Amino acid sequence: MKKEYLKFSKEIKAIIIIILILTLIFGFNDNKPEFILKNWLLNLLYVFILVSMIILFNTLGYKLVAKYLGAEIEIKALNSHVFKDKFRLFKLYKYVFTPVLPVLITLFSNGKFFFTPVGTFDIKDYNIFGRKFPKITYFNHGLIATGGLFFNFILMLIFKSAGLDKGILISSWFIIWQLWPFSNLPGAKIFLASRALYIFSLIFFIGNILLIQSLPVIYAIILSLLVSIILAVIYFYFLEYLKA
C-alpha cells in the first residue's frame, strides 16, 4: 500500500513539474508591446489552465488505452541520466534533452521558440488474460502513445470550436514534439512499435494541425485521414511486406 502511494505521489509530482515547465514555455512571452506585471500574470494563469487541461487529457488517454490493454502507465519527466554516458563532460547530461533544456531555450529565445519534450510515460507489463500475447508488446506501447495524442487532438478540436487560439497553439506544439522519435518520448514508442503506425500518426496529426487553420474541421480530418492511410499502406506494402 505504501509503495503504491509513493508511486502515485511521484507521478503527481511529475505531472505538476511538466505543467509548470510548459506553462513557463508558453506563457513567458505574452506578445504585448510593453511589460505590465498584472497582464503578464493573468496571461500566465490563462496558459496554466490550458496546459493543465492538455496534460490531463494526455494522461487520461494514456491510462485508458493502457487499462484496456491490461497495463498500467506512469507519467514521468524526461530523465537526464539516460544521457549520462554520452554527455559526461561538465555533467552536460543534466541539461541535454531534459526539462532544463526547454527552459533555457525559452529564456534565450525570449519565449518565441516552443521546445516542449519534457515528459513521457513508462509502462509496467501485465498479463493479459484472454488475449493472444501474455505480455504487452511494442505495438501495444505504440497504441498507448497514439491514444494519448489522440485525446490531445480531441481537446484541440474543442479549443477550435470554442475559438481558443492559444489552446490550439499549445496543443499543436505539444503534439508535434511528442511525435519526435527520440529517447523515451511517445513518438519513439510509436516508431519502435511500427513504422507504418508512426507514418500514419505523423501525417494524421500534423496534417490536421496544418489544415484546420484553413479548412472546416470535418474536411481537415477526412483529408488527413485519407492521406495518412494511403502513405502508411504504401510504406507497409513496399518496404515491409514485399521485403519480408
Task: Label every PLM stretch briefly.
Residues 1-244:
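Hydrophobic transmembrane alpha-helices and their immediate loop junctions
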